[in-house]
UniProtKB/Swiss-Prot annotation:
PANTHER family: DIHYDROLIPOYL DEHYDROGENASE (PTHR22912:SF160), DISULFIDE OXIDOREDUCTASE (PTHR22912)
Entry binding sites for FAD: E39, K40, G41, N42, L43, G44, G45, V46, C47, K56, A119, D314, A322
Lineage: Bacteria, Bacillati, Bacillota, Bacilli, Bacillales
Keyword NAD found: yes
Note: The active site is a redox-active disulfide bond.
Gene Ontology biological process terms from the UniProt entry: 2-oxoglutarate metabolic process
Protein name: Dihydrolipoyl dehydrogenase
Class in the EC hierarchy, top level: oxidoreductase
Organism, as annotated: Geobacillus stearothermophilus (Bacillus stearothermophilus)
Keyword Transcription regulation set for record: no
One MF term in the entry's GO annotations: dihydrolipoyl dehydrogenase (NADH) activity
Main location: cytoplasm
Subcellular location as annotated: Cytoplasm
Active site: H446 (proton acceptor)
Length: 470
């Protein structure tokens, strides 16, 4: 503590007000703790401000534009459809503002003290919060670190006006004529799809042999087919070597199939992963155990090697997902309050807002087989569903991974319209230990996309009505 300084006492101090931190703070307050939350940026973190929410708003706007231009098959002919991109950005910002304002209201409504600034650990019960020229010391009984992550910057692709991270791509002032996306993971696919919908010529360079390596190849193939239809070029096994930036664009050099090639574009978007924000917290002062990737090691209650300090979200091992961070935030807050809460990741869903959307929860078929689990893989296509046909959006399928010995659902994958919403039912099924018969016997409204889960369950039972499997 600085000589002459006074410390403000709190019971639980949360560092970071993203989807993990603010949820942890609210849950801790609900459990009767005096809570202080420290945030150096805007409330809501990356997710609400420059991630999940604005990207989905941009994607939604791009789909509206594409549908307006390409609905001739349904008898809708629209000529001279234009984009007011400044208005798109204004609308996107309004969505963000509503949600961040909502977070502030929730924190204040739960009597959580909000402190602006950067927190540095002095010891296991003290942080120093710096905000510009001012600083304040806080002491705490327990702390929850929820500082999130930031985009990885490649050595030969330093972020600039033309070489963008995801934040830069979300905040462009124009629809670019051309865009090179380095990285075919979920961020690259989502933003590449959005700009392709707006009319941008998009090229995706992926270093691996397939895009969306965390999903099944058949799912990736469907997305690639749709991307090709939009005019997107996907180059796999491509190694991005460097970029030459000009005032009006950038030239990217890459290697593919043993050849060195170049491509010109207005902008380059680099989406090759994220780095945990753990390097500027002073964690070395308190001896918290870390992995060699800068992640904080935690137990099943999100407790670090320092017993009164917890960590959640992108800074701990596991997928960097907002809903995972929120879940861990609740667990950490409850653990501090003495509850026996512990994480269970068996039903954490993953979603890509691609076109069509794809989602997964629990086991993939091959993953289950690799672990020696005898499974039934039951698949039902969107093309056999009345609602999908009425939407004129029939690419994709729903697959259930069912344990053969007892019929319990242990995994599910969906690629198709509204997959992001449909996966929730199957996450519940896995969490509750439900069987394929449980889903098959549940009456699903007709005509809906949700019926596809029931139909796939009937396939698993060998009693499908709307598909021939023999």
């Amino acid at each position: 503590m600085v000589v002459g300084d006074f410390a403000i006492e709190t019971e639980t101090l949360v560092v970071g007000a993203g989807p993990g931190g603010y949820v942890a703070a609210i849950r801790a307050a609900q459990l009767g703790q005096k809570v202080t939350i420290v945030e150096k940026g805007n409330l809501g973190g990356v997710c609400l401000n420059v991630g999940c929410i604005p990207s989905k708003a941009l994607i939604s706007a791009s789909h509206r534009y594409e549908q307006a231009k390409h609905s001739e098959e349904m008898g809708i002919k629209a000529e001279n459809v234009t984009i007011d991109f400044a208005k798109v950005q204004e609308w996107k910002a309004s969505v963000v503002k509503k949600l961040t304002g909502g977070v502030e209201g929730l924190l204040k409504g739960n009597k959580v003290e909000i402190v602006k600034g950067e927190a540095y650990f002095v010891d296991a019960n003290t942080v120093r919060v710096v905000n510009g020229d001012s600083a304040q010391t806080y002491t705490f009984k327990n702390a929850i670190i929820a500082t999130g992550s930031r985009p990885i910057e490649l050595p030969n692709f330093k972020f600039s006006n033309r070489i963008l991270d995801s934040t830069g791509a979300l905040n462009l002032g124009e629809v670019p004529k051309s865009l090179v996306v380095i990285g075919g993971g979920y961020i690259g696919i989502e933003l590449g799809t959005a700009y392709a919908n707006f009319g941008t010529k998009v090229t995706i360079l992926e270093g691996a042999g397939e895009i969306l390596s965390g999903f099944e190849k058949q799912m990736a193939a469907i997305i690639k087919k749709r991307l090709k239809k939009k005019g997107v070029e996907v180059v796999t096994n491509a190694l991005a070597k460097g970029a030459e930036e000009r005032e009006d664009g950038v030239t990217v050099t890459y290697e593919a199939n043993g050849e060195t090639k170049t491509i010109d574009a207005d902008y380059v978007l680099v989406t090759v992963g994220r780095r945990p924000n753990t390097d500027e917290l002073g964690l070395e002062q308190i001896g918290i155990k870390m992995t060699n990737r800068g992640l904080i090691e935690v137990d099943q209650q999100c407790r670090t090697s320092v017993p009164n300090i917890f960590a959640i979200g992108d800074i701990v091992p596991g997928p960097a997902l907002a809903h995972k961070a929120s879940y861990e935030g609740k667990v950490a807050a409850e653990a501090i309050a003495g509850h026996p809460s512990a994480v269970d990741y068996v039903a954490i869903p993953a979603v890509v807002f691609s076109d069509p959307e794809c989602a997964s929860v629990g086991y993939f078929e091959q993953q289950a087989k690799d672990e020696g689990i005898d499974v039934i893989a039951a698949k039902f296509p969107f093309a056999a569903n009345g609602r999908a046909l009425a939407l004129n959006d029939t690419d994709g399928f729903l697959k259930l991974v069912v344990r053969k010995e007892d019929g319990v659902i242990i995994g599910a994958q969906i690629i198709g319209p509204n997959a992001s919403d449909m996966i929730a039912e199957l996450g519940l099924a896995i969490e509750a230990g439900m069987t394929a018969e449980d889903i098959a016997l549940t009456i699903h409204a007709h005509p809906t996309l949700g019926e596809i889960a029931m139909e796939a369950a009937e396939v698993a039972l060998g009693t499908p009505i709307h598909i021939i499997t023999k």
